A protein has these predicted regions:
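Acidic/polar low-complexity segments and flexible, solvent-exposed patches
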Residues: 1-72
Length: 72
């Protein structure tokens, strides 16, 4: 199952830092790119079936550390 989420940050530099950090996450079929603008980052990955997948929790925690949040 595929999951996608978009985050928004107060500045382009925070979004860029998030994007570059997430690129190195260990997640199946991970795709990370800028979203609607340079303050938005879109993340898409395949949810691991049959086991607990903490990817979304890790994304949320990292976004929070960089003053970002899930985009509405």
């Amino acid at each position: 199952m595929e999951n996608s989420v978009e985050y928004v940050f107060p500045s382009e530099s925070q979004a860029y830092r998030f994007l570059n950090t997430v690129k190195h996450f260990d997640a199946e079929e991970l795709k990370v790119k800028y979203g609607r603008s340079d303050r938005f980052v879109a993340v898409r990955y395949r949810y691991a079936l049959g086991e607990f997948d903490a990817t979304l929790s890790r994304l949320d925690d990292l976004a929070r550390e960089l003053e970002g949040e899930e985009a509405a």
